[in-house]
Amino acid sequence: MQAYFDQLDRVRYEGPQSTNPLAFRHYNPDELVLGKRMEDHLRFAACYWHTFCWNGADMFGVGAFNRPWQQPGEALELAKRKADVAFEFFHKLNVPFYCFHDVDVSPKGASLKEYKNNFAQMVDVLAAKQEQSGVKLLWGTANCFTNPRYGAGAATNPDPEVFSCAATQVVTAMNATHKLGGENYVLWGGREGYETLLNTDLRQEREQIGRFMQMVVEHKHKMGFQGTLLIEPKPQEPTKHQYDYDVATVYGFLKQFGLEKEIKVNIEANHATLAGHSFHHEIATAIALGIFGSVDANRGDAQLGWDTDQFPISVEENALVMYEILKAGGFTTGGLNFDAKVRRQSTDKYDLFYGHIGAMDTMALSLKIAARMVEDGELDKRVAKRYAGWNGELGQQILKGQLSLGELAQYAEQHHLAPVHQSGHQELLENLVNRYLFDK
């Protein structure tokens, strides 16, 4: 097979002084950070959809890219050609993982039966590619939002027959993920929401999607899948309002249906932006709630109201994200998947490498800065000092339920409490973070 990226052998680490645009300056897979290999901390993955499925089309223009596997031809043969190029890319980029939707890797076919047959053939192709390359599957998922049948949602659709079609795709994609050794399975509700409340029964749709997720959990245990189930929050787009709005909303949903011990979250930076949150906020919230799973590493544009899916380039933002992840013990089954695409004007095939290399270097440098923050411990010390009162007798009595509201009021009066506000020192802490970021 002729190489598609024929001007490149493999992307390698050359160090911070390198000016080679096809080399890593900060990502050194074998470098030890806090006693652990950088590759094992970051667990990078490249995604199939933006990298190999998007043809450069947008709402105002047709496809701008010249990808051989996107030309007219026999669907399965083109899918196999796409797989050839994808695994060439994964190998040359030196990522240990990849991610896909079902219809990214396999033709959808004209019927559910044809869909399943096509997918089964492509799973065998992917299994062989994984064996040859050593690249593993971080997670798989089903695209239950592109087909016109899902215009009113999949699990939240008013038609139970559409719900059943979605179940077919999800069970097939879960089985494929399991067979390929995937470490997670993701559920993103692209159209699980509404356009208008005038034709929407919120209680009904919530019950439907709750039951759907319960069925997914049941199937996971039935098939013996040991990976993690993940919901990916997003507030809107393509619907006006989605039910998985943000991490906190997802947690409330999981609690309602008794799923908080079964499903975690896959957090995308751009989705946090759309929800009016920082990426840091969503990561910290998931960790605090015990549902942190994996990350879609990208960036949005705060001046735009849609999902731009750009590659992450902000060390300032991502150092704080990696700091939270390190403090929480790091990834288990999750990782950093680049849910990002080159711009429509970036028509050189090597732009795919430039985008990923920059993103990987950004996250690697962020990791190293976060490690310095952890080792220094100053931020943790200051937070602990701020809440120290809760480790005292009064604080512990309150938290352990040993005082009622009335008893606490009586205590305050008897002890003539008149506490004085203590400074939060926000500016000092911001300066401290800048020292980690910019001082050698």
From Swiss-Prot:
Note on how the cofactor is bound: Binds 2 magnesium ions per subunit.
Q: Which GO terms describe its cellular component?
A: cytoplasm
Q: What is its main location?
A: cytoplasm
PROSITE patterns from the UniProt entry: XYLOSE_ISOMERASE
Localization of this protein:
Cytoplasm
Q: In which domain of life is the source organism classified?
A: Bacteria
**GO biological process annotation, one example:** D-xylose metabolic process
Keywords in alphabetical order? Carbohydrate metabolism, Cytoplasm, Isomerase, Magnesium, Metal-binding, Xylose metabolism
Q: By its UniProt entry, which InterPro entries does this protein fall under? A: Xyl_isomerase-like_sf (IPR036237), Xylose_isom_bac (IPR013452), Xylose_isomerase (IPR001998)
Offer an example of a GO molecular function term for this protein: magnesium ion binding
Cofactor needs: Mg(2+)
Catalytic residues?
H101, D104
Chain sites annotated for binding Mg(2+) 1: E232, E268, D296, D339
Enumerate the catalysed reactions.
alpha-D-xylose = alpha-D-xylulofuranose
Residues reported in the UniProt entry to bind Mg(2+) 2: E268, H271, D307, D309
So what EC number does this one have?
5.3.1.5
Q: Which Gene3D superfamilies match?
A: Divalent-metal-dependent TIM barrel enzymes (3.20.20.150)
Query: Per the similarity annotation, which family is this?
Result: Belongs to the xylose isomerase family.
Q: How does it assemble?
A: Homotetramer.
Q: Which HAMAP family match?
A: Xylose_isom_A
- This protein is called what? Xylose isomerase
Q: Which organism is it from?
A: Salmonella typhi
